[in-house]
Amino acid sequence: ATGNIGRSLEATLKARDARLVGIDPSDEMRKIYNAPGIFVCSPAESYDYEPFDLGISFLTLMFVEPSKRRDYLRRLLDKCRPGGAIIIFDKLETHHGYFGTVMTRLTLAGKYEAGVDAKEIIEKELSLAGVQRPITLGQLPGVPYQWFRFGDFAGYILEKPI
């Protein structure tokens, strides 16, 4: 919600005379939001969406209560115009068993090797306990098209039929 996506889409938004609405429930994020369009401080699942052609859900669903995810996405699809799409990028539940352990360790090692302080990594991981719950593929409605996968992170497209 800092505006990275909006900034990367700025030229396209201008060329297509499109409107961007950034949504996040955190007032802290509102304060650092820096992108074209407007910022709305609201939980994504309770926001009153207007009809749209393209929606982007970036690291959002893992913070939506699991029992509300499918209904939220169905409501988004209802607001999506025919031929439009919702792009989802989120964290998936980790693989089970040792493979899941390896992926988690590789993720933490990657953060550390990128220069993030070990204490900061641990503090962030602990702060997410009870707040972040990764998604499962079964929580996505319809037949999502997977366009990206790296470790526990995946990207999907939900298309609204014409």
List each model region and its residues.
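A conserved beta-strand element that flanks and buttresses the S-adenosyl-L-methionine
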Residues: I56-S57
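A short, conserved alpha-helix within the catalytic core of class I
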Residues: V64-L76
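Conserved beta-strand signature within the Rossmann-like core of class I S-adenosyl-L-methionine
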Residues: G83-K91
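Core SAM-dependent methyltransferase catalytic element
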Residues: Q139-I162
